[in-house]
Amino acid sequence: YRLVDPDGMVFEAAYDLGILLRNWIDTYRQADPAEELLRRAIWLSEQTAVAKNAIISWGFVEIVSTGIHLAELGYVEEAKDYLQLGEAVATRLTQM
């Protein structure tokens, strides 16, 4: 795989893969959203040979920052989905 940023910016591959974790927000509405996010991060890592922990870290940053940004724009209900997922992931990571 070759990751290409549509804006022509050069970032580490894990950053772009972390954005994918953020974009799957609808799939995390289940009993264990953090487990689903980690499962997807492992899959992305296996497919691309990019470090799993780096993908998870960037995904976490993207999820929380998106939640904060949505809240600032007044989309409080949408923001809750992202911030609750961020909290679930943070809790899971501290247990690992």
Which role does the model predict for each range below?
Residues 93-96:
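Short, low-complexity, intrinsically disordered N-terminal peptides in bacterial proteins
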Residues 58-90:
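C-terminal/domain-terminus segments
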Residues 36-54, 59-68:
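Conserved ATP-binding subdomain of kinase catalytic cores across diverse folds
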Residues 1-42, 49, 76, 82-85, ...:
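Active-site Asp-x-Gly
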